[in-house]
Amino acid sequence: MRVQICAVGRLKAAPEKHLLDDYISRLDATGRGIGISALPVCEVEEKRRLQGSELMEREAELLLAAIPKGALIIALDERGRIETSEAFAKRIGTLRDSGAADLAFLIGGANGLAPALRERASHVMAFGAMTWPHMLVRVMLAEQLYRAVTILSGHPYHRA
Ligand SMILES: C[S@@+](CC[C@H](N)C(=O)[O-])C[C@H]1O[C@@H](n2cnc3c(N)ncnc32)[C@H](O)[C@@H]1O
């Protein structure tokens, strides 16, 4: 199963980018042995000056166009479900075992994800009830994906 993070906005050369690249490459290196690989992070951006719901709907279109066709979608949203790292790892392992080819994680921009996109997702996950900057959410998600593959492969990175 291939996993991909797809986000609104461009991450310039910054400490967050360094961390993100590091976790994605660790995720790919550890995940391949257990049937999970990482696609490059994809970023989308609307250049026109749209506002509010019009902007969110356009960003939703761009996100859906950027992910692999037929990918299962997990949306990142503070109104989503909070779970432990072990439960998240189990969720990823179950999807892999079910034969899912591609799994896309979608992160919104400053306005958040369009409600229709959240409804389309097979799961909506939250890193707590607080709102985090989308640049940090990418890094947090990449780390949790790396942690998940270490849990699934019995690697000692995660200590419960
Ligand atoms: C700055 S936030 C947007 C907040 C926006 N006001 C909203 O209501 O969704 C940008 C993106 O980061 C992600 N995000 C922020 N906080 C999060 C959290 N606690 N859990 C999961 N994702 C989060 C979501 O994908 C969100 O669309």
From Swiss-Prot:
Function text: Specifically methylates the pseudouridine at position 1915 (m3Psi1915) in 23S rRNA.
Keywords: Cytoplasm, Methyltransferase, rRNA processing, S-adenosyl-L-methionine, Transferase
E.C. number(s) listed in UniProt: 2.1.1.177
Main subcellular localisation: cytoplasm
Sites where the protein binds S-adenosyl-L-methionine: L76, G108, F127, G128, A129, M130, T131, W132
Subunit structure as annotated in this protein's UniProt entry: Homodimer.
Transmembrane segments: none
Catalytic reaction list: pseudouridine(1915) in 23S rRNA + S-adenosyl-L-methionine = N(3)-methylpseudouridine(1915) in 23S rRNA + S-adenosyl-L-homocysteine + H(+)
GO terms, molecular function: rRNA (pseudouridine-N3-)-methyltransferase activity
Pfam families, sorted: SPOUT_MTase
InterPro entries documented for this protein: Alpha/beta_knot_MTases, RlmH-like, tRNA_m1G_MTases_N
GO cellular component, one term: cytoplasm
Protein's recorded name: Ribosomal RNA large subunit methyltransferase H
Record-linked HAMAP family: 23SrRNA_methyltr_H
Location(s) in or outside the cell: Cytoplasm
